[in-house]
């Protein structure tokens, strides 16, 4: 097993329903340590840059509009195989297809408002963490 860092973004639907603590409980109970966390409103430019890999997809504009519709919570998570572990506890992208006991099954409202984003690879994790956090913001 390898200790890894991964990125997580709690989406506006969770913040609006005051469920941040509940999401953090899922993450911590799964064995992930929150080593950085901050709340902010993403600008349209930040959202477009962050989701640039989806720019050509039909859902890009609605994704940017949704993710900028309210505050998000940005996180750096640490743990053994943190990327896979986070993806597992998040559940399938579509809450209707997610397994019972996952964040998206229990809290997700739709494919877009599915409560949480998590890095899907080591390269993505590095890029996404660097996009939002300086090294000094990550507390061991």
Swiss-Prot record:
Enzyme Commission code: 2.7.4.6
Reported function: Major role in the synthesis of nucleoside triphosphates other than ATP. The ATP gamma phosphate is transferred to the NDP beta phosphate via a ping-pong mechanism, using a phosphorylated active-site intermediate.
Cofactor or coenzyme needed: Mg(2+)
GO biological process, one term: GTP biosynthetic process
The keyword Phosphoprotein belongs to this UniProt entry's keyword annotation: yes
Major subcellular location class: cytoplasm
EC supergroup of this enzyme: transferase
UniProt keyword terms in alphabetical order: ATP-binding, Cytoplasm, Kinase, Magnesium, Metal-binding, Nucleotide metabolism, Nucleotide-binding, Phosphoprotein, Transferase
Quaternary context: Homotetramer.
Pfam families cross-referenced by the UniProt entry: NDK
Organism: Rickettsia prowazekii (strain Madrid E)
Compartments where located: Cytoplasm
Molecular functions (GO terms): ATP binding; metal ion binding; nucleoside diphosphate kinase activity
Catalyzed chemical reaction(s): a 2'-deoxyribonucleoside 5'-diphosphate + ATP = a 2'-deoxyribonucleoside 5'-triphosphate + ADP; a ribonucleoside 5'-diphosphate + ATP = a ribonucleoside 5'-triphosphate + ADP
Residues at which ATP binds: 11, 59, 87, 93, 104, 114
Active site: 117 (pros-phosphohistidine intermediate)
GO cellular component: cytoplasm
Name of protein: Nucleoside diphosphate kinase
